Each structure stands twice: as C-alpha cells, then as structure tokens.
Amino acid sequence: MKLKVFTKNDCPNCPPAKELAQKIENEGKIEVELFNTDEADGLAEAQFYAVLATPSLILCDKNEDEVEAWRGEVPTREEVYKKI
C-alpha cells in the first residue's frame, strides 16, 4: 500500500496532512509519497487522481489503484489504517 499526499505551498490546512504523512512513514507500514500541486510533477499526479482540493490523501494498492481517498480533508491516523 502507498499513501499519496497532495499539498500546495499556500494551503493553510496542509501542515497537519504533512505531519500525518511523516508519522505514518516513520511507522514503516505504508510507503508515503508527497506531492506539491504547485509543481508540474505534483500537478500531473493530482490530475491523474482527480485531486481538486488540498490537502488530499489517496491510499493506493500495489498497482497504484485508488483504495480510499480523502479529498480536501485530513483523516486521522486510525482512519488510514482501517483501510489497509
């Protein structure tokens, strides 16, 4: 499983999403990727997953298919782990 976290520079609600991503990554159970939608690569990935708001977190399986998504919100750590 992989958690993709989409943020942007001027997003006031993005710091909690980044903190959650860091905690989850440190636990080592899920791979975490951070994407900044102000950058070309981040924007392209956001378009692929239909991310229209930040922060957004997309949980993907090994084939990069979406399993669960939190668009425009930050889930709790427990909500993420329930979907694994």
Where are these regions (language model features)?
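Thiol-based oxidoreductase modules, predominantly thioredoxin-like and allied folds used
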Residues: 30-42
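N-terminal beta-loop-helix "entrance" segment that forms/cooperates
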Residues: 40-50
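Short alpha-helical
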Residues: 12, 40-41, 75
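Non-catalytic, surface beta->alpha helical segment in thiol-disulfide oxidoreductase systems
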Residues: 59-84
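Local sequence-structure signature of Cys/Sec-based thiol-disulfide redox active-site neighborhoods
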Residues: 1-26
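Alpha-helical elements of the RecA-like P-loop NTPase motor core of helicases
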Residues: 15, 43-44, 68, 78
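Structural micro-motif
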Residues: 49-58
